[in-house]
């Protein structure tokens, strides 16, 4: 995979930079967490500093046909403008014709950078038919002379702007964000100091099964929390009440428990939980994990203490998936306790994107408190499952 260090520019031709500005916004369109925009700055500023005219491409959310309201990248263009000190025009390019060349030229002559409107406004971007995606890529390709992918969070997709468009260029490279992400994953794969602890939470075991199978032989401790823990508790004969439970995966949970025992991997489950009658309950009660009556929505204080001690005794920690329903303050203490333990740890601490990265900001922590916070949710998991990311394979 070629990186920006070996990247050469075409004479005067713009460079496509596929960024990932898929950031969370509130109901009035205000960005609530701009990690992904800030993470793109090293690549953008480096290319601008080297005199390259830039055409940025990104997606935002999952707009459906003829439903564009709430999915405009305008707030992202405005936030990026604040960071780089240059006005970043937002260009609506739904009509890919010769008129666009003139508009792009005017903007690039003035600012040196533009942001195309949400690429997912084209249905072809996410089409399952490769022929459709290739048509969109062929329409886009003439507007630039080179291609840089810095959208790690979208690189597990076979979408037109990260897969087919990259194949349209011989002069292409990965940006600094992707390079940084891959270095962090390389550290986990080949340089992880021991004890090596993995914490997995989130809703479903089925979403993390392949990940667990791939990493279990390489770790010393596996801490399980979130909704997926209840399938493991049920496998051990515990009463899980109305908690999230995947009964069809209980046998898989038993296999994982047996494998951990046979390979001296310490598998640690919650010993107490915070349970409540509903997801919106204003208050939960502490219960032993083996006898839950209602819904387990967070790990309890004893489990928090156990997990904290394990983290303090670790040299490498990877965490993906919140410990509970952290969006509700009543059930955020478990996730907060893990963040607090990790932020004060001397270990290499890796936060695995998605909801886990969102919790960092929401619960008042700083991304700099951790060794690495990934910008990719699905991309992060697929790498740890041992998969090759399609968009990186074609660079």
Swiss-Prot record:
Keywords: ATP-binding, Cytoplasm, Glycolysis, Kinase, Nucleotide-binding, Transferase
Molecular function, one GO term: ATP binding
GO cellular component entries: cytosol
Pathway: Carbohydrate degradation; glycolysis; pyruvate from D-glyceraldehyde 3-phosphate: step 2/5
Short name of any one Pfam family annotated for the protein: PGK
Positions that bind ATP: 208, 296, 327, 353-356
Keyword Disulfide bond tagged: no
Chief place of localization: cytoplasm
UniProt catalytic activity: (2R)-3-phosphoglycerate + ATP = (2R)-3-phospho-glyceroyl phosphate + ADP
Subcellular localization(s) per the UniProt record: Cytoplasm
InterPro entries: Phosphoglycerate_kinase, Phosphoglycerate_kinase_N, Phosphoglycerate_kinase_sf
Domain of life: Bacteria
Sequence similarity: Belongs to the phosphoglycerate kinase family.
Subunit structure as annotated in this protein's UniProt entry: Monomer.
Name the record gives this protein: Phosphoglycerate kinase
Species annotation: Tropheryma whipplei (strain TW08/27)
């Amino acid at each position: 995979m070629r990186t920006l260090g070996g990247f050469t520019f075409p004479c005067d031709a713009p460079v496509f930079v596929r960024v990932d500005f898929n950031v969370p916004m509130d109901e009035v369109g205000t960005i609530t967490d701009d990690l992904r925009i800030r993470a793109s700055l090293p690549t953008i500023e480096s290319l601008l500093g080297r005199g390259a005219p830039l055409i940025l491409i990104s997606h935002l959310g999952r707009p459906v046909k003829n439903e564009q309201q709430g999915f405009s990248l305008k707030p992202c263009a405005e936030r990026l403008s604040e960071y780089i000190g240059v006005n970043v025009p937002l260009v609506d390019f739904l009509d890919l014709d010769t008129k666009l060349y003139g508009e792009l030229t005017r903007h690039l002559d003035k600012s040196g950078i533009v942001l195309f409107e949400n690429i997912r406004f084209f249905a072809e971007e996410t089409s399952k038919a490769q022929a459709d995606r290739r048509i969109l890529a062929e329409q886009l390709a003439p507007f630039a002379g080179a291609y840089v992918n810095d959208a790690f969070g979208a690189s597990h997709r076979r979408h037109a702007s990260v897969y087919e468009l990259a194949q349209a260029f011989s002069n292409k490279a990965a940006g600094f964000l992707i390079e940084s992400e891959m270095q962090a994953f390389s550290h986990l794969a080949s340089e992880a100091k021991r004890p090596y602890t993995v914490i997995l939470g989130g809703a479903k075991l089925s979403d993390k099964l392949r990940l667990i199978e791939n990493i279990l032989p390489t770790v010393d401790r596996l801490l399980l929390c979130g909704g997926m823990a209840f399938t493991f508790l049920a496998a051990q004969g515990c009463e899980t009440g109305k908690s999230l439970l995947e009964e069809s995966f209980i046998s898989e949970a038993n296999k994982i428990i047996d494998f951990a025992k046979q390979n001296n991997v310490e598998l640690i489950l919650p010993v107490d939980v915070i349970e409540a009658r509903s997801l919106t309950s204003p208050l939960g009660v502490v219960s032993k994990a083996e006898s839950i009556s209602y819904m387990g929505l967070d790990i309890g204080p004893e489990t928090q203490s156990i997990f904290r001690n394990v983290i303090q005794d670790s040299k490498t920690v990877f965490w993906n998936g919140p410990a509970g329903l952290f969006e509700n303050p009543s059930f955020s203490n478990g996730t907060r306790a893990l963040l607090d333990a990790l932020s004060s740890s001397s270990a290499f601490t890796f936060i695995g994107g998605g909801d886990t990265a969102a919790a960092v900001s929401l619960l008042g922590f700083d991304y700099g408190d951790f060794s690495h916070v990934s910008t990719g949710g699905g991309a992060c998991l697929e790498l740890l499952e041992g998969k090759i990311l399609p968009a990186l394979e074609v660079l």
